[in-house]
């Protein structure tokens, strides 16, 4: 069916009347935005029903993608784009007397995530839909998305950020499909005719209400669903307590249930926080599996073929309880034997690992399981016992048994649970997967080598090129057509235009226009004036020490000191842009944010630096900001310590938009280097193997004493800047360590190499033809990092499902 401008206009008007009791003349911008969303939702709902009926009739295998994070960003433009009606929707809004850009800008980011993990899940859901794979995403319907970051006196302050006020138009609550989750209580068992009968009693009940968000694919009628679970108590308010004036007590159970879906990643440095996190994870897993198995039984009448018709992909270890919960359903509810249930489970679940950091491998105290999840704890103990026996029989080595244990010394290790109960374990870049095999999970890989795979991450190139960068999209279409939108590999055809002066000139003009557009946006949003004649040198990502925002800062300090020494030196203007949120409990990361703002205040107020050097911290970095920033960026800083970044996806988005990478051979940078070569990116620093060897005898203090530039830069941390704040704690952390080894992430070891590479960036930028050619090569060779390719890899090697080629 074709949707014209007039048809959409009429649909929006109807939604205003039926849902908000007003006409376009009375409607607010927010009501117009929600009416647009409802109109698009109706289109997708019809297609969703058709998709479900087709999947049911053909008995197709289904993919269930479980992730505690889904950073969907804004959906109005994205869904309109995928449905092929963005121009018509834009004109319909304008005809109703509203500014389409203003209406699109009204939509809050659906920030149901913290960073790359959630954005990856969103990209993958888009690609699964575009490739016609029957898939459902699952997560929690958080009331408050990731916090809103406010910078006050240079420091991060976290504010609650309610997205549902305007974002709920996309959600379709389905209370009739609610699931009941049980916490606490006690478990009784008895044998009856050779079968173990399990009785769970005296538990606390929580209802999981599904709220479905429809996802349209590009150039297809296929529509998939993101199912978000909202937690509610089934108990009404205690009227007796309420009538006695005990208002809080009367609402206690309701409040406890509501807290499960209030916020992503509650602080867990205390028992209550850990308890709430574990409740969140089990709530999410149990609701999802009950829903999946119920649907499967309705179709097939049995769970014995569950693994033949379903595959569950868990995005990191947060949904790892899917393994014992599926066992519980198969044994307790379906009456299968342990061996039958285990065979089904280990052929149903696949695990994606996203970290090599030991501290990030999730673990839980045993007592939490015993208290909150008594039946799951029983099943976990049996899984752990059988797995430990298998490891013992294979290795006969107590050290390996301990390292691979699911439960050891009162601690539950979730990654080991995923390995024990999963059919596949994949890393997210070639280097990362190699490190998992050789180091992190070496013993498990030695025992079950066929279980370990690699699927390099990818991003939704339609969103991150065509939708957000229409100028570049137009250039690509003029050069090679629009086939790249469904076959990203076609981007390689751009390479043949590398010596076309007109194409390179147009590419430079597009970048300049995007810089101007972002500067206007930054002025409106943050009242900052950017120097658009400067190189836009960008580092935006979650704030973590291994991502080394501090290394970037040290280099900027050295540039500032050079200008102080010689204000008249030849200095190509640079604007350094940072965007990062620190986890609320991560004190060191928060200190680095304050340091960036102290440095920015010093440099931006010093007349010596005017029109030469600028530092800006972009407040509240989010998906919609990235969509403005990435087309305008010229240098992409991907400078993590080699061997620490699993993959990264920001690096891919910058590459697709023609920014040149300044980076280490880490994560997906390695594969970028394979397609770009030394000549099209700026590499520096130690390799992962070199970093591992250096740590055995590393002394950062020696570097401090031998390098006068580094010495002076670090001393500046102690002195601080004009705001009077000293950063001696960071100085001490780098040189002597604190609760960690000195310079744990090798900033000082890579400092000189990083400065030299940064100098090469500036020198190369002066040769505009060369720079633009390098930029074109980056765009041309970025197709391998499309999420479509990633999903095809999963479909071929792990899920074994067909997809649209």
Where are these regions (language model features)?
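A conserved ligand/cofactor-binding region detector
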Residues: 1-805
């Amino acid at each position: 069916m074709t949707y014209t401008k007039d048809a959409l206009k009429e649909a929006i008007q109807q939604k205003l009347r039926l849902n908000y009791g007003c006409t376009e003349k009375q409607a607010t911008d927010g009501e117009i935005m929600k009416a647009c969303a409802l109109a698009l939702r109706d289109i997708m709902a019809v297609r969703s029903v058709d998709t479900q009926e087709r999947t049911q009739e053909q008995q197709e295998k289904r993919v269930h993608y479980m992730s505690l994070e889904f950073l969907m960003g804004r959906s109005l433009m994205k869904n309109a784009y995928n449905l092929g009606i963005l121009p018509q929707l834009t004109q319909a809004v304008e005809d109703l007397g509203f500014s389409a850009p203003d209406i699109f800008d009204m939509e809050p980011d659906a920030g149901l995530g913290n960073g790359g993990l959630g954005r990856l899940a969103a990209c993958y859901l888009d690609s699964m839909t575009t490739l016609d794979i029957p898939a459902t995403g699952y997560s929690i319907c958080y009331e408050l998305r990731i916090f809103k970051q406010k910078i006050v006196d240079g420091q991060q302050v976290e504010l609650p950020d309610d997205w549902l006020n305007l974002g709920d138009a996309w959600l379709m609550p389905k209370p009739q499909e609610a699931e009941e989750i049980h916490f606490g209580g006690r478990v009784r068992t008895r044998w009856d005719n050779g079968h173990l009968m399990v009785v769970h009693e005296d538990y606390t009940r929580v209802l999981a209400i599904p709220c479905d968000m429809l996802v349209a694919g590009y150039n297809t009628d296929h529509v998939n669903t993101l199912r978000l679970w909202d937690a509610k108590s089934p108990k009404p308010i205690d009227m007796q307590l309420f009538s006695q004036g005990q208002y809080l007590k009367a609402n206690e159970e309701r409040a406890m249930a509501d807290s499960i879906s209030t916020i992503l990643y509650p602080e867990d440095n205390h028992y209550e926080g850990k308890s709430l996190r574990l409740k969140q994870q089990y709530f999410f897993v149990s609701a999802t599996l009950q829903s999946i198995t119920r649907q499967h039984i309705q179709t097939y009448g049995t769970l014995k073929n569950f693994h033949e018709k379903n595959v569950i992909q868990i995005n990191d270890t947060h949904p790892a309880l899917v393994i014992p919960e599926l066992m519980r359903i198969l044994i307790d509810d379906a009456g299968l034997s342990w061996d039958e249930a285990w065979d089904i489970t280990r052929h149903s679940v696949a695990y994606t690992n996203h970290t090599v950091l030991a501290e990030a491998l999730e673990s839980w105290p045993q007592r939490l399981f015993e208290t909150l999840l008594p039946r799951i704890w029983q099943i976990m103990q049996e899984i752990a016992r059988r797995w430990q026996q298998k490891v013992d029989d294979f290795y006969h080595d107590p050290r390996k048994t301990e390292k691979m244990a699911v439960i050891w010394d009162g601690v539950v290790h979730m990654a080991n649970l995923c390995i024990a109960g999963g059919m596949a374990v994949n890393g997210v870049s070639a280097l990362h997967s190699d490190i998992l095999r050789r180091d992190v999970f070496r013993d498990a890989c030695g025992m079950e080598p066929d279980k370990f795979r690699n699927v390099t991450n990818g991003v939704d190139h339609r969103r991150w090129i065509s939708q957000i960068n229409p100028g570049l999209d137009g250039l690509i279409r003029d050069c090679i057509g629009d086939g790249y939108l469904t076959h990203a590999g076609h981007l390689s055809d751009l390479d043949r235009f590398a010596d076309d002066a007109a194409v390179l000139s147009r590419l430079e003009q597009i970048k300049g226009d995007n810089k101007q557009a972002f500067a206007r946006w930054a002025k409106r949003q943050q009242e900052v004036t950017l120097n658009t004649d400067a190189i836009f040198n960008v580092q935006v990502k979650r704030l973590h020490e291994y991502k080394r925002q501090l290394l970037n800062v040290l280099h900027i300090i050295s540039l500032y000191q050079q200008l102080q020494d010689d204000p008249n030196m030849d200095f190509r203007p640079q604007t350094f842009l940072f965007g990062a949120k620190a986890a609320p409990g991560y004190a060191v990361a928060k200190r680095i944010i304050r340091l960036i703002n102290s440095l920015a205040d010093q440099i931006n107020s010093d007349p010596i630096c005017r029109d030469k050097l600028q530092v800006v911290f972009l407040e509240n970095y989010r998906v919609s900001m990235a969509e403005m920033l990435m087309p305008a960026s010229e240098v992409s800083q991907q400078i993590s310590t080699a061997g620490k970044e699993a993959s990264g996806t920001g690096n891919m988005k910058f590459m697709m938009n023609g920014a040149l990478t300044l980076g280490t051979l880490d994560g997906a940078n390695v594969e970028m280097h394979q397609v770009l070569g030394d000549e099209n990116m700026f590499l520096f620093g130690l390799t992962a193997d070199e970093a591992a060897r250096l740590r055995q005898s590393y002394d950062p203090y020696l570097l401090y004493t031998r390098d006068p530039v580094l010495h002076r830069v670090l001393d500046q941390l102690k002195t601080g800047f004009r705001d009077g704040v000293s950063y001696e704690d960071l100085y001490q952390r780098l040189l002597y360590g604190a609760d960690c080894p000195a310079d744990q992430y090798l900033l000082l070891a890579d400092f000189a190499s990083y400065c030299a590479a940064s100098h090469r960036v500036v020198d190369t930028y002066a040769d505009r033809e060369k720079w633009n050619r390098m930029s074109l090569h980056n765009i041309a060779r970025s197709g391998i990092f499309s999420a479509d390719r990633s999903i095809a890899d999963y479909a071929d090697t792990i899920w074994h499902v067909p997809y649209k080629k």
